[in-house]
UniProtKB/Swiss-Prot annotation:
Part of the 50S ribosomal subunit; part of the 5S rRNA/L5/L18/L25 subcomplex. Contacts the 5S rRNA and the P site tRNA. Forms a bridge to the 30S subunit in the 70S ribosome. It comes from Mycobacterium leprae (strain TN). GO terms for cellular component: ribonucleoprotein complex; ribosome. Disulfide bonds: none annotated. One of its GO terms (molecular function) is rRNA binding. This is Large ribosomal subunit protein uL5. InterPro entries: Ribosomal_uL5 (IPR002132), Ribosomal_uL5_bac-type (IPR020930), Ribosomal_uL5_C (IPR031309), Ribosomal_uL5_dom_sf (IPR022803), Ribosomal_uL5_N (IPR031310). This is one of the proteins that bind and probably mediate the attachment of the 5S RNA into the large ribosomal subunit, where it forms part of the central protuberance. In the 70S ribosome it contacts protein S13 of the 30S subunit (bridge B1b), connecting the 2 subunits; this bridge is implicated in subunit movement. Contacts the P site tRNA; the 5S rRNA and some of its associated proteins might help stabilize positioning of ribosome-bound tRNAs. One of its GO terms (biological process) is translation. The keyword Ribosomal protein applies. Keywords: Ribonucleoprotein, Ribosomal protein, RNA-binding, rRNA-binding, tRNA-binding. Belongs to the universal ribosomal protein uL5 family. PANTHER family: 60S RIBOSOMAL PROTEIN L11-RELATED (PTHR11994).
Length: 187
């Protein structure tokens, strides 16, 4: 086995060298373990039309695998809903939970490449925090990620991205994500 060191993601290095110290100064924590960090990122793609055509879920699985670098979990309906022609156990979405290095690399690609590619992008809403520092937002189409070949898209799919932090308040979470490069709108 070689003694080569594993390359740390760029955003993770920046967090450890600059951002943690800045957050500690801003909020003056008594313990370094109180400094907020990103715990995980959950990327969810709902495919409601898969209830009528089961092949649609395969396109969502391949798109999400390309975007995140990890095989997504197919989510199935928990109960039947007759109005939607949905039966219990039918696949209706895909989800990926990213942690550690894959999470940091995804956040880096999201903030530096994907979000700037959105047409007429004015920034993320600072009001979508959940009260304890976690942030959730949606993207209208998967083509903003450079891993997706626009010519091979079978249909436009949006996705929900949930950034879970160890922050205890929205202000701490907002400061952490702003320092990581999330472009929030100014009120």
């Amino acid at each position: 086995m070689s003694t080569a060191e594993k390359v740390q993601p760029r955003l993770k290095q920046r967090y450890r060298s600059e951002i943690r110290e800045a957050l500690n100064k801003q909020f003056s924590y008594g313990n370094v373990m109180q400094i907020p960090t990103v715990v995980k990122v959950v990327v969810n793609m709902g495919v409601g039309d898969a209830a009528r055509d089961a092949k649609l879920i395969n396109g969502a699985v391949s798109d999400l695998a390309l975007i995140t670098g990890q095989k997504p979990e197919v989510r199935k309906a928990r109960k039947s809903i007759a109005q939607f022609k949905l039966r219990e156990g039918m696949p209706i979405g895909v989800r990926v939970t990213l942690r550690d290095d894959r999470m940091w690399e995804f956040l880096d690609r999201l903030t530096s490449i994907a979000l700037p590619r959105i047409r007429d992008f004015r920034g993320l809403s600072p009001k979508q925090f959940d009260g304890v520092g976690n942030y959730t937002f949606g993207l209208a189409e998967q083509s903003v990620f450079h891993e997706i070949d626009v010519d091979k898209i079978d249909r436009v799919r949006g996705m929900d991205i949930n950034v879970v932090t160890s922050a205890t308040t929205d202000d701490e979470g907002r400061a952490l994500l702003r320092a990581l490069g999330f472009p929030f709108k100014e009120n």
